[in-house]
């Protein structure tokens, strides 16, 4: 009766999360280009409402854009249906 050494089993268990082909040359992430990295200063959105430009012809409507009570009614009607056995 031959038994495998315990160290071999531990080595196999330690390598479970390594993806296939991870040890091949060139398998790492490619270097990032400077032109692809976003600059923080460019993408800063305006923080107050005065800085935002309104869309011409747009009207400010009262209330939310979606009827919330309708969504809540539909959500309350939903119920869990178990899978039918075949």
From Swiss-Prot:
Highest taxon, organism lineage: Eukaryota
- Pfam families on file: Chisel
Q: Which GO terms describe its cellular component?
A: costamere; M band; muscle tendon junction
- Name the InterPro entries for this protein: Chisel
Give the span(s) annotated as Disordered.
20-64
Family to which this protein belongs:
Belongs to the SMPX family.
Q: What does this protein do?
A: Plays a role in the regulatory network through which muscle cells coordinate their structural and functional states during growth, adaptation, and repair.
Q: Report the protein name in the record.
A: Small muscular protein
**Organism per entry:** Pongo abelii (Sumatran orangutan)
Organism lineage reads as: Eukaryota, Metazoa, Chordata, Craniata, Vertebrata
- Gene name as annotated: SMPX
């Amino acid at each position: 009766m031959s038994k495998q050494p315990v160290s071999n089993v531990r080595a196999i268990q330690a390598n479970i999360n390594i993806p296939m082909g991870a040890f091949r040359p060139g398998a790492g992430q490619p270097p990032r280009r400077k032109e692809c990295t976003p600059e923080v200063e460019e993408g800063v959105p305006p923080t107050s409402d005065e800085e935002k430009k309104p869309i011409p012809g747009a009207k400010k409507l009262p209330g939310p854009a979606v009827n919330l009570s309708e969504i809540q009614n539909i959500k309350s009607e939903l119920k869990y249906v178990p899978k039918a056995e075949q």
